[in-house]
From Swiss-Prot:
Complexes and interactors: Component of box C/D small nucleolar ribonucleoprotein (snoRNP) particles. It is associated with the U3, U8 and U13 small nuclear RNAs.
Record PTM Asymmetric dimethylarginine, positions in chain: R5, R11, R16, R19
Protein's name according to its UniProt entry: rRNA/tRNA 2'-O-methyltransferase fibrillarin
Record's function text: S-adenosyl-L-methionine-dependent methyltransferase that has the ability to methylate both RNAs and proteins. Involved in pre-rRNA processing. Utilizes the methyl donor S-adenosyl-L-methionine to catalyze the site-specific 2'-hydroxyl methylation of ribose moieties in pre-ribosomal RNA. Site specificity is provided by a guide RNA that base pairs with the substrate. Methylation occurs at a characteristic distance from the sequence involved in base pairing with the guide RNA.
Residue numbers spanned by region Disordered: 1-27
């Protein structure tokens, strides 16, 4: 369940899809 968006212009990845980093992101 990787459905999350990045916060800082990056793709999110993770169960909750928290804040994203510079490139990837994820929670």
């Amino acid at each position: 369940x990787f459905e999350g968006r990045g916060g800082f212009g990056g793709r999110g990845g993770g169960d909750r899809g928290g804040r994203g980093x510079g490139g990837f992101g994820g929670g």
